[in-house]
Amino acid sequence: MTSKPLAEALEEAFRHCRDMDASLSERLGSLARAVRTLSPSFADAVDRLIARLQQSGAGESAPQIGEPLPPFHLPDEAGRMVSLDELRSNGPVAVTFHRGHWCPYCRLNTVALAQVQKEIEREGSQIVAIMPDRQQFAEEFKTESKARFPILTDMDNGYALSLNLLIWVGAEMERMISAAGWDIPSYQGNTSWMLPIPATFVGGTDGRVKARFVDPDYRKRMEIEGLIAALRSAH
């Protein structure tokens, strides 16, 4: 346990996990263990949130393989509008949803995506990241992760809602996240305390989902090797 807010105390562990020579799932697992060590009460609250979401079937009705991936038209970190139709005209697209620039698991995920972006682009595919944070935070997120792909702002989680990915964190997690030092209302520009379930959809040039990873346990993400394989298969 630590007297520092969790957000601050976790930075050293985040940097360690980011720099590990390991798979994304191993890095995420190491981070989850660090969270539990630093704040057992926070980790226990997360476990309760995940159990509630799993019991309610959160994310199960998000687009399935073979179904159309609904279009979007969202601003990137520089304010430019980016559309799914525009992206998929150049090849398969990995559409990744993140809780925000503040989420250490999302940060690890985005760093891992940035590390393989050149390989993905060489094979004629693309990546786009979507989160509910305002533009200034999208810019910070992109800079920190060294990503060259667009970081899009889904204001008020409208697109996530259309994909049945939106969840309310609940009163307990509101308190825990705030006490940890993360100011979600400021980041999003609203007080709804709604977050997207982290998810990855591989969309083909025909507009249909070729692969998906949707898990209400935000500590888990699509493995990078699996994403690369799915993008190859989508051609």
Segments predicted by a language model, with ranges:
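Non-globular targeting/processing and membrane-anchoring segments
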Residues: 1-90, 122, 192-235
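Loop/helix-junction capping segments adjacent to catalytic residues or to phosphate/diphosphate-binding pockets
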Residues: 103, 135, 221
